[in-house]
Design a protein with these regions (language model features):
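Glycine-rich beta-strand-to-loop/alpha-helix junction loops that act as flexible
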Residues: 24-27, 152
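Short, flexible loop/turn elements at secondary-structure junctions
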Residues: 27, 59-61, 86
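C-terminal scaffold of the Radical SAM
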Residues: 33, 40, 44-47, 56, ...
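Conserved alpha-helical substructure of the radical SAM core
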Residues: 1-22, 31-55, 66-67
């Protein structure tokens, strides 16, 4: 609450049409439900007071279900971005994502069915990824018609599954030049 209040005070002199309170940098709906409610209750108060116009979050496809969507709807969430990463099953498997492409399609459909704005995040350079898989994923994302689409290069973070694969010599991250060219 204090962080949001402090940040909001810096915006008073700006002429901004839409101010969003966003929960990024992780899988929001993967945290315990009570913690989600605690964060969202603060965001909802800001929205109801008119200080913000939208509540925005990112999560994983396998952290979407009807209970979660009902909760997000109750707290007036507007935008859900899914870290889809890839629509190619071999890439999801090699990256140890823990879900299949059916889960991705189902989650996207449910989010749209509930009336949320859908964002799809794709990631290039994951294990087993190829130019062809990237094009396939981009086309599949376009077929779903998300309102937001983001494309990220893979960044390996210490103490993750990708980091372990890299340490074992089983995965080599894409270099900056290749990421830009792709």
């Amino acid at each position: 609450h204090n962080i949001v209040s402090e940040y909001m005070s810096t915006l008073s002199h700006m002429n901004m049409e839409t101010i969003e309170l966003s929960f990024f940098g992780g899988s929001f709906t993967g945290i315990p439900m009570q913690e989600q409610k605690d964060f969202l209750s603060i965001a909802k108060k800001y929205k109801e007071s008119g200080l913000i116009q939208k509540i925005h979050l990112s999560t994983r496809p396998d952290y979407i279900n009807e209970e979660i969507l009902d909760n997000l709807k109750a707290y007036s969430v507007d935008v859900i971005e899914l870290g889809v990463q890839s629509f190619a099953q071999p890439v999801l498997d090699a990256s140890c994502r823990g879900h299949d492409t059916a889960c991705v399609y189902e989650s996207c459909a449910k989010i749209k069915e509930y009336g949320f704005t859908l964002g799809i995040q794709l990631m290039i350079g994951l294990p087993m990824d190829t130019w062809e898989y990237d094009i396939f994923s981009a086309r599949e994302a376009a077929k779903i018609h998300p309102e937001i689409a983001r494309l990220y290069p893979t960044v390996v973070i210490r103490d993750t599954g990708l980091f372990q694969l890299m340490e074992q010599g089983l995965y080599t991250p894409m270099g900056e030049k290749d990421a830009v060219e792709r």
